[in-house]
Amino acid sequence: MDMIGIIFILYLAFLLGVGVWTFKFNKTQEDYLLAGRKLGPWVTAFSERASGESAWLLLALPGAAITIGLSESWAVIGIIFGIIASWFLIAERLREETEKYDALTIPEYLHRKFNDSSNIIRLFSSVIIAFFFLFYVSAQFHASGKVLNSLFDLDPITGISMGAAIIIIYTLMGGFYAVAWTDLLQGILMIGTLVILPIAGYIELSESGMTISDSLAAANSVFKNNNSSFFGGKDGFAALITALGGLSWGLGYLGQPHLVIRYMAIRSSKDVKVARKIAIAWALPGITGAFLVGLVALVYFGPEYFLTVDPEQSMPILAKSLLHPVLAGLFISGAVAAMMSTADSQLLVSTSAVTEDFYHQYLGKDLSQEVLVKLSRIMIVVLGLAAYGIAIFSEIQGKKIFGVVSYAWSGLGSAFGPALVMALWWKKTTRKGIIAGLLVGFLTTIIWANIPALKALVTERLSSFIFAFLAVYIVSLQTQNES
């Protein structure tokens, strides 16, 4: 086994060790799901960033930069502004509100704030979270197969199986304590990858005389996507839709349950201001760096190379080609870190939706804290295996990580984003308005994503968010008698 493989295995052993070490800290359901609301600003910020930027950032975004080109830069801009908006609009108020209502989850917070005696908010929220997170977690498992295929030349199915097993085991053992503290290290590895790899690539390219502009021009004829155009070769209204489609990635940050739960777990609302600065400082070079990794790989290998090699494997391939094996091993571990950080967080949030919101609260099962924690661990295995099955299916069908993540991101962001923003900032928001927003965001995403004519017109990330926001607003105005 080479040096890269040794470093990778040592890193995975470390993750499992953290899971064993943090097992003893989980005495209550609040400990298991929110780390007892005791996280400091640095851990919170890095955990939010590491779990927010999944394998999508280190695998799918570079792949999109290669095959789509400069028009994907709108997504980079949208993501950065979405992160900033989430920290300013959601973080501090949500931390205060969830403690005020003694809520461990987003469904529970919305239920208690709007005094939903019907339990419809809790039920709808739980279904939405469980449904879309199965796809989202499956994308992370799928990504593990791609990285391990690149690293060890393993069959992708074997890689998916290994990655899924590791994530399920250490999330099962450590809960949110394990997730948050490993996210701190993984966030450091990820930002190191996204800053150093493009710089190393640029130095290599400058010495060879190759340029990004020439490679983008060549990619135009290879991928047929007008790669050298910021608007994909379109003009007028079509160009505007292209830009808005990329920018719409930012809207999802307002409602991703696995991200906003970090705001709920921070030690105090005062720590939010410090964590916000750290997270934004991470995002600016991190998101931009991922896009540059794709462009550097395009120049270094040439567009034709990616007709036979998966563009979503460009980051690990580039790291192995340019860097010392020790550094390459760390950075490829960073790619797996990105996948694990998101998958473990999503497994926890999905589990909380089933055990805390549905079983404990909706069905009214009065269980001890010890039994609730055990039930949560059982659900992690069940949901993890379901996501594993979807990942295997995606690999067999040849689906891209980019598309699966976009679908789940849209569904979660549009269902919860408008509901959370309005609940935190608009006093006229009503219970029925929240229910309408959840339902419209959920259904619009599913319908829009599965009708090619609508999807070709505008992405579901934008349409579903707008319709859900309007639903909350209009229905709330029509039901002011209950506010």
Predicted regions: what is each one?
Residues 1-483:
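Membrane-embedded helix-loop-helix hairpins and adjacent transmembrane boundary segments
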